[in-house]
């Protein structure tokens, strides 16, 4: 089950939904107002949750509730600032920083010291260590290697626009990340510029900079090694 259609308050029976969901239009996250269907799917209300929370984990509910699904493990040193929802059977790695507005689906793995802010992470996605994922969507079964970065702010301080099959959309958002399609695989230190879309089943080699929307395919940098000193 995809979380994003519920968060957009979209008509799930619509016959002509946009090719790419307008992920920037989702409503502010209020955990106790999620639909019962979502709560059941994320196993937020089961009687025996068996959640494992290690020592020195900080759960800060000053700005909103933090709700965690069954059989999820939160490792040593992680910081979670509500409002946040984490589904069932997830692993939140050591010193991960989960910031407000984030909702994480079932079976997600978050690596060491990764920071996630105001993002939707769909089911069975894997996000490696030391990544920064902000104002973005990571679709189901996507894999992000270490130190992947989603840029969410233009240096000229202009609102972020998104190029879609329907045309260029002025989102009005000062901060907006990207949409990473399902089953995409991103190598170490990939950087995605604001408002970009990576199509499903796309593979990006290490250190690729995503400057434009990418259709499904395999992409890599061409490297030239020059030996000197002989």
From Swiss-Prot:
Q: Tell me the GO molecular function terms.
A: acyltransferase activity; nucleotidyltransferase activity
Q: Which InterPro entries does this UniProt record tie to the protein?
A: GlmU-like, Hexapep, Trimer_LpxA-like_sf
Record family assignment: Belongs to the transferase hexapeptide repeat family.
Q: Which UniProt keywords apply?
A: Acyltransferase, Repeat, Transferase
Write down what this protein is called. Answer: Putative uncharacterized acetyltransferase YaiX
Its EC number(s): 2.3.1.-
Q: Which SUPFAM superfamilies match?
A: Trimeric LpxA-like enzymes
Q: Does the keyword Cytoplasm apply?
A: no
Q: Which PANTHER family match?
A: N-ACETYLMURAMATE ALPHA-1-PHOSPHATE URIDYLYLTRANSFERASE, NUCLEOTIDYL TRANSFERASE
